[in-house]
Amino acid sequence: YFYRNKMEFSFSNARWLTQYEISSEENFGNKDALGFHIPGMWSKILDLQECFLQEAPSNDLRLAVRNYAIKNGLDFFDVRNQEGFLRTLMLRQNSQGEWMVLFQLYREEKENREQLFDYILEKFPQIKTLVYAINPKQNDSIYDLDVQTYFGEGFIYEEMDGLKFKIGPKSFFQTNYKQALNLYRKTLEFAEISENDVVYDLYT
């Protein structure tokens, strides 16, 4: 539990309903959701209330964003019609308890965006940097998008046995810090590297 340093969640105006909810024929009203995609149902999102994959305050932060957005009438993404405002939320942390928050927005709504960002920055002082990207594409890939920094430096740092890593919104970094550290240490042990050896990283 609580081993991942990076989690990505999707906004949707089509919350996944259980078979019980469907058979009840109740009118559920608001169907906005922030969470995970349902396997085999690309347009449906499981509205997460609690996730055991990432440390606190991940749950509180995600729910604060969700509840603020619903309360203030912000449009959750409609993947079928390709419209809406809020698209994805990425939460990333380092081992020092500092957080990066990344929003993907389908369109720009400057006033709504700034009010949402200011709200969570005030509520969660653990946030070291907050970044966002406008993504009107058909997919959620961020690598060809222009990421804007709203707060902080636009990245966080991680350290492993004297090595310092600069991690940005597009960076790949092992999602399990403790196991990555064990892996690096075991690799050094197997390699039997001395202080006089020259080491080449051929896979960067």
What residue ranges belong to the model's regions?
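Accessory RNA-recognition modules of RNA-modification enzymes
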Residues: 1-204
